[in-house]
Amino acid sequence: SLVKNPVLLSLFVGTAVIATAYYTGYSYVEPYLQQIGGLSDEAITTSLMMFGVAGVIGSFLFARFYVGKRRRYWYIRASLAGVALALALMMPAALGGMGSVLAVFVLWGICGVSFNVAYQSEILRFAPPHAAAVATAIYSGIFNLGIGGGSAVGGAVSTAFGMGSVCFAGALIGAAAVAIACVFLIPAMRRTRPVE
């Protein structure tokens, strides 16, 4: 019955796609920064720490701005688009040095946490109370599949086209996630009454 709910189905499909996009790039971010940007191990470690800090900021932004229907719709679009944009900007950022990488990582980290908590929030909003735990478990399982799928896609792209193409591939997949949200998820959220 969960997959018959258009909102939940769109969330599950969208989760698979955006998690794949995210981890297509993130799984290879260290060798990417080493090979493309020539960053040292210390610089990469510092950059990844900023990634984590940005995730915490994303949680605070969610708590502050994820209220009201229109804000929720825009928040979802913006967080997904931010992940895709960050992946698309990784090549010029890596070539531009550590400052550019940090800026992109802030965007990526904030938006990565933002879409995750937003999707979990909508699952709880639209899943029947008796099935909320199952819906959340399905979401977690799909997200984990996306992690594995992203790693596999990144590896295949790196082998076929070189490390420099990995984040571009992630950006294209991320753009598909934005399209799913705009064409299917948000219209379904507008049509479907949340569970009280």
Which positions does each model-derived feature cover?
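Extracytoplasmic gate region of multi-pass secondary transporters
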Residues: V7-M49
